[in-house]
């Protein structure tokens, strides 16, 4: 924890967490509607559709936990929650990559939405590492 009066929280990181929270909520709802569209109009195998929807709900859980711990760690200037958020960035990135590249059918809208999610993940990872470095350097003083 930082000394009294010394603030090490990253404002750009907090802005990214806030924007990503709203963006992910929109992404999740749009992705549900896209799966409904795919299930009704495309010859989408039922097993694949169920798997993709279940994975989307798992992705929701991972992303909500990641954003919660990232925000908590940044605002409270704690390394452990921010480290958990960094660790959860990798499964989150893998899920976004799966929905970008490995689904049965990938629509152009999904490609754009997942590219934006990957941009958020990459930017947040960079700022989280910089913030963790700042927190660690203050512990040594």
Curated annotation (Swiss-Prot):
Major localisation: membrane
Keyword match Nucleotide-binding: no
GO cellular component annotations of the record: ciliary transition zone; cilium; cytoplasm; cytoskeleton; membrane; MKS complex
InterPro entries named in the record: Uncharacterised_TM-17
Family matches, as Pfam families: Transmemb_17 (PF09799)
TM region positions: 15-35, 49-69, 82-102, 115-135
Annotated coiled-coil segments of the chain: none
Keyword Glycoprotein: no
A biological process from GO: cilium assembly
Protein topology in the membrane: Multi-pass membrane protein
Subunit and partners: Part of the tectonic-like complex (also named B9 complex). Interacts with TMEM107.
Protein's job: Part of the tectonic-like complex which is required for tissue-specific ciliogenesis and may regulate ciliary membrane composition.
Descriptive protein name: Transmembrane protein 216
Species for this entry: Bos taurus
Source species taxonomy: Eukaryota, Metazoa, Chordata, Craniata, Vertebrata
Gene responsible for this protein: TMEM216
